[in-house]
Amino acid sequence: LISCGAVALMYLVAEKLFDERIGLIAMLLTAINPWQFMQSRWSLDCNLFPHVFLLAFYLLLLGLEKRRYLYLSMIFFGLTFYCYGIAAYSVTAFLFVFFIWCLWKHQLKFREGLLCAVLFIIVALPETIVLGINAIHLGKTIETPFFTMQYFPDSLRSADILLLNFSFAQLGRNAWALFSRVFLQLPDIFFNSIPAFGPLYHVSIPFVFVGIIVFTSRLFKEKKIEKQTQMLALWGFLVTGIWVGLITYEVNINRVNIIFYPLILLCAYGISLAVGKFKKLMPVIVIAYVVSSALFLVTYFTDYAEESKQYYNRDFLDAVVKADGMEEYDRLYITGNLGWQFNQSATEILTQYACKIDAQYYQSEDYAQRYHYIYPEKSGAELAEIVGDGLMVLYEEDLEYLQFPYEIIDEVGEYSLVVTQG
C-alpha cells in the first residue's frame, strides 16, 4: 500500500520540481519499476525508509512556500530513523546541509530553522539514544514510562559504518558496490532484483546519466534562488543516496534503497530532455519500456514467483499454520531447516508471524510449553524422548535423521507433520 501511494507521490514531487509532463513520466516509471515491485514483495523494515523519506521530501518542498508543511516534514524526517538505522548519518546530513543553505540564502529565518531542528530531534531522539547506547556499548537498557531504549549486546551493525572503521581500501570496495549494483545494475541478492532487468531496467541508465548531468549543470546556472533551492533539495536527495552507498559496508540494493527515487525522477527528466531534443525518440522509448516491463511482469509472476516460494518460506509457513490448527497436540516441535538455510531464530520469527502470536502470549509460559524449535540432525535418537506425544514439523531432508519409528500424518509441500510411534 505504501509503495502504491509512492507512485502518486512521485507525480506530485516531479510536478512540483519540473512540470506536469515530467510528473506523468515519473509516475509511470515508478509504476513499472522493477525495484518498486521487488521491495514491495520483500517486507523488510529498511524498505520503508525511501517511502517515508519521499513523503518528508515532498512536504519539505511545500514547506519552502508554506511553513506548516515544513514543520510537518520534520516529523516524517524524524520517523525515518525508525525505518532504517542509516537515517542517523544520512537524513541528518541532508537536513543539516540543506538548512545551512536556506539560512545562507535567506530562504528560512533562524527561528524557523531552530523550530524545525527541535521537532526533528524530539521525534528522532529515542531511536538516536538506542543507536548511541549500542555504539558505546553502554551495557544496559533505558526504560521510561512511554518507551524503552534497548541495548543489544550482540549487535554488530556498527561494523558496517565506514566512519567508525575507516580505511581507503574499504571505501573503494563500497564505491564499487554502489556503482555496480545501482548504475551497472549487476546481479544482486535474489530478493532485490531479477538480473535480466536490474532495479531500474537497463534501458533507463542512459537517461539517468543525461538527467543527472543536465540537472546538475542547470542547478549551478539557475539565477532564481527559490527555484535553485528546490533543485538543490533534489540534488541533495541524490547525493544522500550516494553518501549512504559510500559509507555503508559494501551495499546491496536494499541498503542503498534511498537512491532510487531521485534516480527515477532524474530518469524522467532525462527522457523529457531526449524527447524534447529528438521527437522521433518517443515511440522508440515507449516500445522499449513496454517490452521491458512486459517481460519483467511475465518473469515476476511466473518463474520468479515459483522460485521465490522457497526463499519466502511458503511451504514452511503453510505447514506451521496447519500444525498449529491441530489442537489435539499440546506441543509443537518445529525444525530450524528452511531448505535454503538452517536458521532456528528465523523459524521462530516465522512461526510467530504465521500463527499470529502477539507479544503478551510470546512472553507467557503457555508459549514456552507449546512451541519448541529443534535440530533433528543433531538430536538423533534423543529426539523421540524430547517430542513424546507432540507434533513435529520437519523438512523433507530431516526425515533421514529420525532414529525411531514415526508416522507422517500430513504433508505440506516440502514439509511433513510427523508423530512418533510406539
Residue ranges and their predicted role:
Residues L1-F18, L55, F207-F215, Y269:
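Transmembrane-helix motifs of polytopic, lipid-linked glycan transferases
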Residues A26-A31, F77, F81:
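Short helix- or helix-capping micro-motifs
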Residues Q39-S40, Y89, I205-P206, K227-G276:
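Hydrophobic/aromatic-rich transmembrane helices and adjacent perimembrane loops
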Residues M38, S90-I213:
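Transmembrane-lumen/periplasm boundary regions of multi-pass, lipid-linked membrane glycan transferases
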Residues M282-E327, I334-Y353, A359, S364-P376:
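Membrane-proximal, lumen/periplasm-facing interface regions of secretory-pathway glyco-
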Residues I75, F96, V118-I121, L265, ...:
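Signature aromatic-anchored transmembrane alpha helix within multi-pass, membrane-resident enzymes
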Residues L17, F53-L72, T80:
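Membrane-interface transmembrane helices that cradle and orient dolichyl/undecaprenyl
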Residues W35-C46:
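Short acidic/glycine- and proline-prone juxtamembrane loop motifs at membrane-interface regions
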